[in-house]
From Swiss-Prot:
It comes from Stachybotrys chartarum (strain CBS 109288 / IBT 7711) (Toxic black mold). The keyword Iron applies. The chain crosses the membrane at residues 18-38. This is Cytochrome P450 monooxygenase SAT11. Pathway: Mycotoxin biosynthesis. Keywords: Glycoprotein, Heme, Iron, Membrane, Metal-binding, Monooxygenase, Oxidoreductase, Transmembrane, Transmembrane helix. The keyword Transmembrane helix applies. It is a single-pass membrane protein. SUPFAM superfamilies: Cytochrome P450. CDD domains: CYP58-like. GO terms for molecular function: heme binding; iron ion binding; monooxygenase activity; oxidoreductase activity, acting on paired donors, with incorporation or reduction of molecular oxygen. Signal peptide: none annotated. It is found in: Membrane.
Length: 526
């Protein structure tokens, strides 16, 4: 009597039974993985929901199916389990602002970015998507001189010139009795500024009638794909190989990214390949990525396209949204607007209300407005985990093994009642008081992250905030149009926060809409 082999048994099975057997074996495999993650995993001692830690399934449901709502489930976990929780099988989230700078550490500690968070937009050659600590430090070093506070002195006249163009556009809208979105016009401003820094010239997005352009539309569309891209990073890579017409039929949002990359290539490749020198101080593109002292593999077209995509996204939408949110809070808190204008009125009279950045930074109330606007705009609130590679970390009684992804969302830091009493309120005075009492509150403003991977554009963003708010808030009177606090509601965390969709109104973008009702003081010069 012979014993049949497994192959012979499968060969004799009906195809339906074979598929059923394979499905059962796969289910058994998944159950074993879930059992391991819950009871045998090195992080099994960290509190958390068993449903969350068994695998990526709960996170996938809330992030992909519910379009970015896992952050609120994490909030519930913290309420139930405490300040440290496992949010999936491999990542720990901590809700304790005092531990923020341990996670997002500065200095030489080797801290990688979590590889699971960088694949969404398929920009692997960008500095922001660089996982390895040492490679990131090298790539950032190539760009640092072009985004330092000192280098902004050369960019300041360009920012002022673009703000003057913005003020002229506001006058046109006033004359036409238009309703405009502050998000739109501020996006055009910030896109022109970042292009000036990256290419050495801007493309006058402020002249576009409705302020819809590829950078802005691309960012808004692609945030809807962000979480799906995290779970299926090769999806974007594969789809990008298809003809653009087909991509637009399947995923219009991805087509916007392709158009934007084509625009970067058209605007930058010729300049990049023809120069290949470090002589240009105006363009980070030519000056940094064209420097012959940089290794050749870091001076490629792929690097240009990926770096350009991230720069335009990050340098446009986060700052423009912060400007719009700050103006919303000034308009809904008229006493704050009155105090700000009174402080600005103490400055010497100048054409178009132009003052140097150094002068504006010395004004305590304006500084409070800028920082409070940043706090309540939040910036990116999705988790951006860091991975300490060579050392175990200790949080209270819990040892966290080296190689474990750790995160803390900006949302929890900016709403920490111990740091910010009445965190839902717009109170510029809290920053003045903190400065007078030598409280390092600015350490806990985390829109730009902290540590060795802090946003390289932080100084430029602050410059745009100071220069723009000081002139726009002083020059014109605005009325909000069909815009309430509900438009700032945070329902979906798709990189940045988005409110619930309101059909026929904001389409889930939460844009700040206004009507210009007059000039505040003297006529603005053309």
């Amino acid at each position: 009597m012979t014993i049949p082999t497994s192959f012979e048994m499968l060969k004799g099975m009906h195809i339906k039974d074979a598929f059923l057997l394979i499905a059962m074996l796969y289910l058994g495999y998944l159950l074993c993985i879930c059992f391991y993650n819950i009871y045998l995993h090195p992080l099994r001692h960290i509190p958390g929901s068993k449903l969350a830690v068994m695998g990526p399934y709960l996170e996938f449901y809330h992030e992909v199916i519910r379009q970015g709502q896992y952050l609120w489930e994490i909030e519930k976990m913290h309420d139930k389990y405490g300040p440290i929780v496992r949010v999936n099988e491999r990542e720990i989230h901590i809700r304790d602002s005092s531990y923020y700078h341990t996670i997002y550490a500065a200095g030489s500690r080797k801290t990688n970015k979590d590889a699971a968070t960088v694949g969404a937009f398929d920009v692997p050659n960008s500095t922001a998507a660089t996982v390895d600590h040492d490679q990131h430090r090298a790539r950032r070093g190539y760009l640092n001189p072009y985004f330092s506070k000192r280098s902004l002195a050369n960019l300041e006249p360009t920012i002022h010139e673009r703000i003057s163009k913005l003020l002229n556009r506001l006058e046109q809208h006033q004359n036409n009795d238009d309703i405009i979105t502050l998000d739109g016009i501020f996006s055009a401003l910030t896109a022109d500024v970042i292009c000036s820094r990256f290419y050495g010239k801007h493309f006058d997005y402020l002249s576009i009638p409705d302020y819809h352009f590829v950078v802005r539309d691309g960012f808004q569309g692609l945030t809807k794909l962000y979480h799906l891209g995290r779970f299926l990073p090769t999806l974007v890579t594969i789809l990008k190989c298809l003809p653009q017409q087909i991509i637009r039929l399947i995923l219009p949002n991805l087509a916007d990214l392709i158009v934007m990359r084509d625009e970067i290539q058209a605007n930058g490749i010729a300049q990049f390949t023809s120069s290949q020198t470090a002589d240009s101080k105006a363009s980070a593109l030519v000056g940094a990525l064209g420097d012959k002292n940089i290794p050749p593999h870091e001076r490629t077209v792929a690097r240009l396209l990926d770096e350009g995509t991230v720069f335009l996204f990050a340098g446009t939408e986060t700052t423009s949204r912060t400007l719009a949110v700050t103006m919303f809070y000034l308009l809904t808190n008229p006493d704050c607007l009155k105090k700000l204008r009174a402080e600005l009125d103490t400055l010497p009279s100048t054409e178009d209300y132009q003052h140097s950045l150094s002068t504006l930074e010395s004004l305590p109330y304006l500084s409070g407005v800028v920082h409070e606007g940043l706090r309540l705009a939040f910036g990116p609130i999705t988790r951006s985990a860091r991975v300490p590679m060579n050392v175990d970390l200790q949080y209270k009684e819990y040892t966290i093994p080296a190689g474990t992804p750790l995160s803390m969302s900006t949302y929890f830091v900016h709403t920490d009642k111990e740091l910010y009493p009445e965190p839902e309120k717009f109170k510029p005075e809290r920053w003045i008081q903190a400065a007078e009492e030598n409280i390092p509150l600015k350490k806990f403003l985390t829109n730009f992250s902290q540590g060795s991977r802090q946003c390289i554009g932080i100084s430029m963003s602050f410059a745009e905030m100071y220069l723009t708010i000081s002139r726009v808030a002083r020059a014109y009177n605005f009325e909000l149009y069909e815009t309430t606090a509900a438009d700032l509601d945070m329902t979906y965390a798709r990189i940045v926060p988005y409110p619930k969709e309101i059909p026929g109104k904001t389409e889930g973008l939460g844009e700040i809409r206004v009507k210009i009702v007059g000039k505040n003081h003297s006529q603005i010069e053309e």
